[in-house]
């Protein structure tokens, strides 16, 4: 459900239309996601908490010994063992407090950054499509999030639309998953759009750290809340095997605009 968290929640609300006092029970390890915080803050929500210690009698002895020894009295243990909803996830590179909102200043350069999904099936990742800008003061701005789950033709058309809508200078796309295909998709929609392919030659942690540092240094802002992007930024851990689409697009976009991306080629 975490992959489709807001969709799952929204659909669940539609099932509560009958009866005099419909209610629902939501149980989860409280990851610091925007939607979970919204639910907790809702005045109609009654919050109860349980801890791993409440359930020790039902857990395997070796599990109890290993998990409690490893996580007891740690910040990760506050979430995983004590069931606390933390403001920030321990070990995450991004923090909620570093994300600020303001109107965009005059922009010096704009790009549409794409992290293409490998497949377009129902359970596939979305294709991350972010519009990134750097203003005349040298600050980075997230201008739009047009990420979607769809076919190459669908995300190609959306990316080109965003390029024209925001008067971008170029489209930047990760080429590790089919560089020639990406170029073909975009050029089929509009042959005049400049495309820059970028290749991941180092690990994501190494690529992500400089962009996360821009946020910590107050050199970044969002023109409005982007809940899905912000959840990915603030819950991704460097050892996480998953590859969040919006986060990747964010890294590629601002590496291009503010950090001088390497290992890339114009086509």
Residue ranges and their predicted role:
Residues 1-2, 117:
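Conserved Walker B
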Residues 3-71:
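ASCE P-loop NTPase helicase motor core
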Residues 10-11, 17-24, 82, 87, ...:
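Catalytic phosphate/metal-binding cores of nucleic-acid and nucleotide-processing enzymes, i.e., regions
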Residues 56-117:
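ATPase catalytic-site recognition across NTP-hydrolyzing enzymes
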Residues 111, 128-239:
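Mg2+-dependent endonuclease catalytic cores in nucleic-acid-processing enzymes, primarily RNase H-like
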Residues 114-127:
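An active-site-proximal beta-strand-loop segment
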Residues 245-248:
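Conserved RecA-like P-loop NTPase helicase motor core
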Residues 253-267:
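Acidic two-metal-ion nuclease catalytic site recognized across multiple nuclease folds
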